[in-house]
Each structure stands twice: as structure tokens, then as C-alpha cells.
């Protein structure tokens, strides 16, 4: 759909449709590469982010969500994604998008992913601090911070994310993972190796009613996944 099709009328139609079913629009996704070396593509991507931000302001969406890109045109992993140069490129290119979000009263939320430029909590913290805007926040997807090289340290990685980013977490993605053929494969929560106790406690203690969305479910396991995480929430004891 063209950016020009994201009109106020279309936005109001969708807002009313969701409201009629008592549904929030938690995240309006715009997952494009803000670090592409192709300047023409970058300009097009920035324009599309701004169109989504305008639409989000009319939809009443919680956030416009994005990941943080790669230093190549294919949006694929390479070691340079984890360099300081790559982080500087992303910060430079996301800054005008955040400034536009400020004008429109919308939150842009970045999602750290191990294979992308913002690959860990410390790099995410640096982006937040460099930009210095309350309109830039975090989508916390714990599985996306993991890789075959670090998944056994997931409890400490999650703890670090909560400590370093907790105040700025606006949305939480809930999924699970299994190890298959030497790689992590994302699956529905409750069907893999993740322990969500630490995250559920964080939600209950610090983030009441935060938008928390299930990922990697199927029609066959979606209800079971919701029941699994709901039970963890209901039985979690906090002081």
C-alpha cells in the first residue's frame, strides 16, 4: 500500500473497526532498514516511517515499532552490524524519524535483535541516551536478544535488559525458542526453552497493563500459548 493511501479517513475507519471489537492497536509495525547504504532507499524508508507515524497518531496506536537494520542492502547479518560505525549510522538516521514522532505525539519503539545493529541492551541504552527523547522507547523481545552463541546465558541477558532498559520498555513480545540444527528457531511460548518467570514479575511489579503480544503462534496453539502465559501471570507472587 502506498504511503499516500494512509489517509485520515482510512485511519479512522480502522480505529473504529478495532474499537468495535474492544481491541487496542498495540504496535503499528514499520520494519524497514534505517542503515541501508542506498541513499535513495533510505529516503524512501524515512518517508514511509513518517507516513506510519502520521497514521499512528490518528489510529491511537501504542507505538510505531521497528527493528534497527543492517549495514547492507539485503538487511542481513554481518559482523559490521555490531560495530560502533554501524551504531552511529543508525543513530544519525533514526534521529529525524524521532523528531517527527515528537511533532505528531507518537512513540517510536525500537526492538533490539541480536543479528541487527542494536544487538544488546547496552547498545539500545546508548541509542536512547544519544537521542534523548521520551518519544523513543523500547520493544522488549527477549528471544530476539539471543543467538546460538549466548542462549545459555539468557537469564543474565534478560536481567541486564530489564535493569538497563526497564524504564523505557513500552511493549513486550512473548515467544519461545528451540535449538535445531545449530540455530535458534522461534516457536510459541510454552513450547520451547524460555522461562518467563523473571519477565512476568517485571510486568507485574513495574509495567501494569503494558501491551504484551504473542508471537510465532499458529491457529492450533494460540489459545494454549495465551493460557500458558496467563497462568504464569496469575500465579506470580509479588510483594
Name every feature range the model reports, one short phrase each.
Residues 222-239:
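C-terminal helical cap(s) of enzyme catalytic domains, especially alpha/beta-barrels
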Residues 189-192, 198-206, 210-213:
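H/E-rich (His + Asp/Glu) clusters that bind or coordinate divalent metals
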Residues 28, 91-193:
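Acidic/histidine-rich catalytic cores of soluble enzymes
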Residues 12, 17-20, 36-138:
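Active-site acidic/histidine proton-transfer and metal-coordination neighborhood
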Residues 1-10, 33-39, 72-78, 115-120, ...:
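Acidic-and-aromatic substrate-binding clefts and catalytic sites of carbohydrate-active enzymes
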Amino acid at each position: 500500500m502506498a504511503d499516500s493511501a494512509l489517509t485520515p479517513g482510512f485511519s479512522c475507519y480502522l480505529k473504529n473497526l478495532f474499537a468495535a471489537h474492544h481491541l487496542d492497536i498495540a504496535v503499528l509495525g514499520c520494519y524497514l532498514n534505517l542503515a541501508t547504504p542506498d541513499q535513495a532507499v533510505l529516503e524512501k524508508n524515512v518517508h514511509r516511517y513518517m507516513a506510519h507515524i502520521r497514521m499512528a497518531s490518528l489510529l491511537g496506536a501504542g507505538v510505531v515499532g521497528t527493528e534497527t537494520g543492517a549495514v547492507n542492502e539485503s538487511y542481513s547479518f554481518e559482523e559490521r552490524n555490531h560495530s560502533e560505525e554501524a551504531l552511529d549510522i543508525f543513530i544519525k538516521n533514526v534521529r529525524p524519524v524521532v523528531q517527527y514522532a515528537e511533532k505528531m505525539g507518537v512513540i517510536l519503539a525500537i526492538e533490539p535483535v541480536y543479528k541487527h545493529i542494536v544487538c544488546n541492551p547496552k547498545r539500545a541504552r546508548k541509542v536512547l541516551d544519544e537521542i534523548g527523547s521520551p518519544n523513543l522507547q523500547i520493544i522488549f523481545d527477549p528471544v530476539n536478544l539471543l543467538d546460538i552463541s549466548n542462549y545459555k546465558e539468557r537469564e543474565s541477558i534478560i536481567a541486564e535488559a530489564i535493569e538497563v532498559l526497564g524504564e523505557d520498555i513500552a511493549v513486550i513480545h512473548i515467544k519461545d525458542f528451540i535449538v535445531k540444527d545449530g540455530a535458534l528457531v522461534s516457536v510459541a511460548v510454552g513450547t520451547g526453552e524460555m522461562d518467563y518467570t523473571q519477565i512476568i514479575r517485571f510486568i507485574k511489579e513495574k509495567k501494569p497493563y503494558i501491551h504484551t503480544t504473542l508471537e510465532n503462534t499458529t491457529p492450533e496453539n494460540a489459545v494454549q500459548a495465551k493460557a500458558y502465559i496467563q497462568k504464569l501471570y496469575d500465579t506470580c507472587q509479588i510483594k
